[in-house]
């Protein structure tokens, strides 16, 4: 799939609640570019009913090489889930990663439970 400036590169994510076996819907995600000492907030979004964002977090001309950080606001999500307690163990989960090829697809899934998480570079 080609986007805005002809490059197919994009950044996407998907959040799954492994405790419930369902997508983590309405989970807030902030995307930062890391340069120097002050992270720059690029965007904030929420996951849809499928645990995905409605649009790529980066694509086309916004897809630059560099270091980025996704901050998943798991505490908000876990605290509002009906079957969870009022004080979740996890709060904001930062995942820092690098983009070396602006024409590549970078997919950063998050598998989330009340007491742990895992991630990997997906496809």
Swiss-Prot record:
More about this protein: HIU hydrolysis also occurs spontaneously, but more slowly.
NCBIfam families on file: hdxy_isourate
Taxonomic classification: Bacteria, Pseudomonadati, Pseudomonadota, Alphaproteobacteria, Hyphomicrobiales
Protein name (Swiss-Prot/TrEMBL): 5-hydroxyisourate hydrolase 1
InterPro entries: Hydroxyisourate_hydrolase, Thyroxine_BS, Transthyretin/HIU_hydrolase, Transthyretin/HIU_hydrolase_d, Transthyretin/HIU_hydrolase_sf, Transthyretin_CS
UniProt-listed Pfam families: Transthyretin (PF00576)
Molecular functions (GO terms): hydroxyisourate hydrolase activity
Subunit structure as annotated in this protein's UniProt entry: Homotetramer.
Family: Belongs to the transthyretin family. 5-hydroxyisourate hydrolase subfamily.
Catalytic reaction(s) noted: 5-hydroxyisourate + H2O = 5-hydroxy-2-oxo-4-ureido-2,5-dihydro-1H-imidazole-5-carboxylate + H(+)
PANTHER family: 5-HYDROXYISOURATE HYDROLASE, URICASE AND TRANSTHYRETIN-RELATED
Enzyme Commission (EC) number: 3.5.2.17
